């Protein structure tokens, strides 16, 4: 049986690029997406991608979406003020649902001082990476730079 992959944030810039590239390599039946607004995902649903309505703030929606999924491409939250708790929800729900592997979109610079304008982002990534490392799940941490080409 082919492994199922779920991409979070698939209607955003990065998630959409990842999904479109995966659609070139894999059948849509292997792909699922988690989106907050399903009306923004009709183009992918029409291609045969399974669309789940969910939110990083809603733990139950994550559990529902992650059932029968093997791997998650986890796009970090854009909600800076809530992202630490949201990321914790994603990792805990993935573990509870039996996810085999998470690919997490982290950040390359994480040695910021507390007065740095990007300290909140860096600290959230550090915590998320720590949770992943201690989760017992297989993981890959991508160390992205700041996105400037969208």
Question: Predicted regions span which residues?
Answer:
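N-terminal Rossmann NAD(P)H-binding glycine-rich loop of SDR-like oxidoreductase domains
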Residues: 2-26
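Nucleotide donor/acceptor-binding cores
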Residues: 3, 29, 100
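NAD(P)H-binding glycine-rich loop region in Rossmannoid oxidoreductase-like domains
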Residues: 6, 33-97, 110-113
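Class I S-adenosyl-L-methionine
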Residues: 23, 42-45, 133
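Conserved SDR Rossmann-fold cofactor-binding beta-strand/turn motif
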Residues: 26, 35, 143-144
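A generic structural motif
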Residues: 26-31, 137
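Glycine-/Pro-rich loop/turn segments that contact NAD(P) or position catalytic residues
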Residues: 76-150
């Amino acid at each position: 049986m082919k492994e199922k992959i779920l991409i979070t944030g698939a209607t955003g810039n990065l998630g959409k690029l990842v999904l479109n590239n995966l659609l070139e390599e894999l059948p849509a039946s292997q792909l699922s997406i988690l989106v907050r607004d399903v009306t923004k995902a009709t183009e992918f649903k029409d291609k045969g991608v399974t669309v789940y309505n969910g939110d990083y703030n809603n733990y139950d929606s994550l559990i529902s979406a992650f059932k029968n999924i093997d791997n998650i491409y986890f796009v970090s939250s854009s909600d800076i003020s809530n992202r630490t708790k949201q990321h914790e929800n994603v990792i805990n729900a993935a573990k509870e649902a039996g996810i085999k592997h998470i690919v997490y979109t982290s950040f390359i610079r994480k040695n910021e001082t507390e007065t740095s304008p990007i300290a909140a982002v860096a600290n959230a990534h550090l915590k998320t990476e720590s949770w992943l490392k201690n989760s017992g799940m297989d993981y890959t941490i991508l160390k992205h730079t700041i996105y400037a080409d969208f």
